[in-house]
């Protein structure tokens, strides 16, 4: 089941499966494919409040779908404090493989849970805003939102 709604950073599509949100992504498509479930409505409500700086945490049920390595990276990304940034290399070191910064970048690119897994907090070695699946403007917007 999917549900799409508009936000300040673009249309967000939510995917629910088995009572959990398994995907939060920016999309070009607007509208909803079916009547939203209570969980999809709750997730939309929380995300909308988050993007208005009215909420700091999202606490609806999620399920991360990915390889064991991707899930390890995603958990490490969730440890980055709101408003802070870390480099791909620092996250590679955090998961125990200081030479895996490119693999960390690839895991970020496959992140199914925008906002829950904060890939926007990961920056290049020179602290430059690089490598965000939804573009650097969205990355900058999310980082600025978190420091307000």
Residue map of PLM features:
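Short clusters of hydrophobic/aromatic residues that line enzyme substrate/ligand-binding pockets
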Residues: 58-62, 104, 129-132
